[in-house]
Amino acid sequence: MCQAGEDYAGPAQREPPPVPRPSREQKCVKCAEGLPVVVIRAGDAFCRDCFKAFYVHKFRAMLGKNRVIFPGEKVLLSWSGGPSSSSMVWQVLEGLSQDSAKRLRFVPGVIYVDEGAACGQSLEDRVKTLAEVKRILGNTGFPFHVVALEEVFSLPPSVLRRASQEPAGTEEAYKAAVDSFLQQQHVLGTEACASPAQGQGQLRPSHSQEPSGTVGHPKDAQTEALSRLFKSIKTLTAKEELLQTLRTHLTVHVARSHGYRKVMTGESCTRLAIKLMTNLAMGRGAFLAWDTGFSDERHGDVVLVRPMRDHTLKEVAFYNRLFGVPSVFTPAIDTKAPEKASIHRLMEAFILKLQTLFPSTVSTVYRTSEKLVKAPREGCATGPSGPNCLLCMCALDVDNADSATAFGAQSSSHLSQMLTAEAGTPTRPCCGAGEGQTQSCHRAVGRREDAWACIIEQLCYSCRVNMKDLPSLDPLPPYVLTEAQLRSQRGSVSEEIQEYLIEEEEEEDRAEPCEAMKQEAEDKGIGL
């Protein structure tokens, strides 16, 4: 029987058991001698030296297992000032030191993109942040490039074109490059012994030979244009995606301009697990292998690599704390945003809360991403000759003829909106009575709709959804609009000349009668 005042609430959720702290009797799980100072997982307590060896080995193993970076290559380190990218720069700095057992063999540089205008920072705060950034990067000894995000308004349209890529090196080619590099270092070492004054400068990485690129104050017009662009976007999800896209375009442009073949990013295992779930929710499932894999070759001549993808955020925080890795705090575009403000924030809260209850959540999602293979869909055009998304540069793997897909439904919706707009257009002129002004507003509206359709048809499904939150194309950087127009013109010219080209089947059909006539003439003894 039910009783008044009876509490029918469910049982209260139990909080996860606290992580056991290392006691005085507990020893390091690696050396079994030192006192543990860090507990990564339950039962995995490391002393200071063993934790450092464990952390460094992860970084070196990720680079050595993939063998994407060849000796002597110029590598650009994308540094945001956060914990993961700061730890990555620190690992490279220690790997190039003379005390390292196995020295890294590439030539590094660092890039920092100032995103203060997009995040709403004041000019005074940006100046203070840049001063701290230059101080930290100056202590590394690497050539660094500090650029403002406003410079995207002066980028060339070639940034959105996939450059020609050399074929991937084989195992033998990598070994040959290592042997050649070691011989070169041996020759330099011999010369250094003969003339120590001259050889001492040659043994060290030539960081001072390339001038460091620093940013001045960006133009007020560009700062205002960038602020207007991000203020016009309705949702935080679209803002974060556009910010990431513009940052990547600017980084790739700087890498190409200064001869860098690889770009290192500091995305950790935890961040990649969140990114995988976020991209799935945003309709980017076809590009997960590129967005979360070790290497990303979508730009062709510049390859993005993620050497920190095996480190969790917890390990990164412990390492930076124990060994004093410097970093710079800069507010992001989603700072102080509520949990449900964007898909990124929602997925981040979901993964991190699940990780507190089930400590294997991040590793499980991460291991799933490792199994993804960069195999395009059957019948999909890929590579330099195939169409790529105008913004994210991924292959357009959508099927325009399949109306059952979400992409087809989106295209049908866009077409119906255009037909509705045309049906509602008044027949009489509305812009003055002059001959030259008749129906000028309708022509302007038609041009805007044509430009919008030109942009939309060159985007993947995820970028199309995000572009819905942009009410107008006017705030976009000029290089995006210019490249969209050039692609549309090239497509129109290709369609016009297509009917004059002889296809392979027609050429074979024409070749068969010629071969038959030639064979018949040979049988009759007549030479053709």
From Swiss-Prot:
It is found in: Cytoplasm. This is Cytoplasmic tRNA 2-thiolation protein 2. Plays a central role in 2-thiolation of mcm(5)S(2)U at tRNA wobble positions of tRNA(Lys), tRNA(Glu) and tRNA(Gln). May act by forming a heterodimer with CTU1/ATPBD3 that ligates sulfur from thiocarboxylated URM1 onto the uridine of tRNAs at wobble position. Pathway: tRNA modification; 5-methoxycarbonylmethyl-2-thiouridine-tRNA biosynthesis. GO terms for biological process: protein urmylation; tRNA thio-modification; tRNA wobble position uridine thiolation; tRNA wobble uridine modification. The modification Phosphoserine is found at residue 416. Residues 511-528 have a biased composition (Basic and acidic residues). The modification N-acetylcysteine is found at residue 2. Belongs to the CTU2/NCS2 family. Residues 1-23, 196-219, 504-528 are annotated as: Disordered. The gene is Ctu2. It comes from the Eukaryota. Component of a complex at least composed of URM1, CTU2/NCS2 and CTU1/ATPBD3.
